[in-house]
Amino acid sequence: MTQEFNYGTGRRKTATARTRLYSGTGKIVVNGRPYDEYFPRKSLQMIIRQPLALTKNVESFDIHVNVQGGGVRGQAEAVRHGISRALLEVDVEMRSSLKRAGFLTRDARKKERKKYGQRAARARFQYSKR
């Protein structure tokens, strides 16, 4: 039998997180592994828990996340974005606090592409006057 869940998609840089919130005890699973195993750095674990701590729902939901693309920081921030969006489906009253904290805003900053005739996105080749 399928269990009722709330869904949220989060993105950051090239990372995409598909998040499902089930009513439960606070267990977070990322790509089939516990989140503290998938993100061993405490700072990244804190990023993931931020929307839950802000809305006082740390032990109210079991969260299953499928995240792809990007690096570990981008993935953690995509998960945070996805959890925040899924929490809105649970209770729309959380919107103001989540919005104020900036968890609902898609951070659109991406890596700028390298241009031809230059060494990098903005850096030019070294120029010798003489």
From Swiss-Prot:
Protein name as annotated: Small ribosomal subunit protein uS9
Source species, domain of life: Bacteria
A GO MF label: RNA binding
Keyword Isomerase among record annotations: no
One Gene Ontology cellular component annotation held by this UniProt entry: cytosolic small ribosomal subunit
InterPro entries linked: Ribosomal_Su5_D2-typ_SF, Ribosomal_uS9, Ribosomal_uS9_bac/plastid, Ribosomal_uS9_CS, Ribsml_uS5_D2-typ_fold_subgr
PANTHER family associated with the record: RIBOSOMAL PROTEIN S9 (PTHR21569), SMALL RIBOSOMAL SUBUNIT PROTEIN US9M (PTHR21569:SF1)
Source species of the chain: Oleidesulfovibrio alaskensis (strain ATCC BAA-1058 / DSM 17464 / G20)
